[in-house]
Amino acid sequence: MALWGGRFTQAADKRFKDFNDSLRFDYRLAEQDIQGSIGWSKALVKVNVLTIEEQHQLEQALNELLVEVRSNPQAILQDDAEDIHSWVESKLIDKVGNLGKKLHTGRSRNDQVAVDIKLWCKQRVIELQESVRNLQRHLVQTAENTQQAVMPGYTHLQRAQPITFAHWCMAYVEMFDRDYSRLTDAYNRMNTCPLGSGALAGTAYAVDRDSLAHDLSFAFATRNSLDSVSDRDHIVELLSIASLSMAHLSRFAEDMIIFNSGEANFVELSDRVTSGSSLMPQKKNPDACELIRGKTGRVIGSLTSMLITLKGLPLAYNKDMQEDKEGIFDALDTWQNCVDMATFVLDELKVNVERTREAALKGYSNATELADYLVSKGVPFRDSHHIVGETVVYAIEKGKGLEDLTIPEFRQFSEVVGDDVYEILSLQSCLDKRCAKGGVSPLRVAEAIAEAKTRFA
């Protein structure tokens, strides 16, 4: 049953109907459409469109429909309704007869879909935050278990300074914490109810929109009807948050792929998140991480698509806006799946402590410590930087580490070097000295872990 047939003298061509209909994807808004319809029925009582008895009858029927939807949402797709709004109204009329035709009084599909998608987005934010928080908890647990795992830290993918695997884990805790807080910010901005805005100019019935907003668990009603039905900022914002978080996940995945390589051998991924080769029997491929990395472009593509869709639209509603749903549905599903998979990857991750330490001892990652040592002896840092650079070249030529050089060898480059230099060149000293807040010293990392465990409890 179409909701708009009276104006037309010819039926829509099947080709157009197939092109125009959205039930195949907006069926996911069924629960929200029913929720909004129950709220609207209560508002209509207050403006004398419905009696209390009629509203109770409608609410009972809508709740029955809600139970049916929750038990088998895919059954909706067997219908040929244009969209989820048409489907809900049709099923309601089947249950209560002509009374069901009164429900749409004063309401447009424009404000109806606007409230549906906001309700859906609000629920998804809550679910996504729980997934992100769960990933953070797993990162913190992994950090707690790997505080003694010294490894190289990298810049430009070159060994730079020693860190611990725990410090690496806690870096991602911080990234995902920003994603979590962005979801909170987005939730607060989208927590406004557009229902009662009509097609664009507001409803002709004196509906108490503030009361309606509270009934539907919104903070307050939107302030401008024209903006209310054309606003898709919340979708763009969620797509933006998803895209940025996927970039964080992609970096996590890339690190894991590198750490898991035979050349690095820092970690071993579980058999349960890897796959083999159809030709090469020895292969164990990090497919979970590669798919996380690969799906990032898919989510970013949804953001780009939505921005381009909106950029030239005149006020207020345009059918172009129907294109908002498939992108947001797919992007948030993909994001949550990737967050959950990253959590699963951490579950049985094995860190090769011996190998990470061996790698940390190579690459002259203690060179900065030698420069700081010279500064402590009164050498200006810029001079000490140059001196250490020359010392490293010498050590490379001799096939030695800095800690293996003799005092006479050190003094070829600076006379201030004494026997106390060896103490500061050890891995432990390199870590311990980074004791400012946020640094890699074991004390600071332990503090960060304890603070995060308290925060995420």
Swiss-Prot record:
Judged by the first EC level, this protein's enzyme class is lyase
A single GO BP: L-arginine biosynthetic process
Extract the Pfam families matched here: ASL_C2, Lyase_1
PROSITE patterns (UniProt xref): FUMARATE_LYASES
Reactions performed catalytically: 2-(N(omega)-L-arginino)succinate = fumarate + L-arginine
Record's Gene Ontology CC terms? cytosol
Q: Could you tell me the superkingdom of the organism this chain comes from?
A: Bacteria
Database matches in CDD domains: Argininosuccinate_lyase
- The membrane spanning regions, by residue number, are none
Write out the pathway annotation from the protein's UniProt entry.
Amino-acid biosynthesis; L-arginine biosynthesis; L-arginine from L-ornithine and carbamoyl phosphate: step 3/3
Gene Ontology molecular functions: argininosuccinate lyase activity
Q: What is its EC number?
A: 4.3.2.1
Q: Which UniProt keywords apply?
A: Amino-acid biosynthesis, Arginine biosynthesis, Cytoplasm, Lyase
Q: Where in the cell is it found?
A: Cytoplasm
Q: Which SUPFAM superfamilies match?
A: L-aspartase-like
What's the family? Belongs to the lyase 1 family. Argininosuccinate lyase subfamily.
Q: What is the protein name stated in its UniProt record?
A: Argininosuccinate lyase
Species the sequence originates in: Haemophilus influenzae (strain ATCC 51907 / DSM 11121 / KW20 / Rd)
- Taxonomic lineage per UniProt? Bacteria, Pseudomonadati, Pseudomonadota, Gammaproteobacteria, Pasteurellales
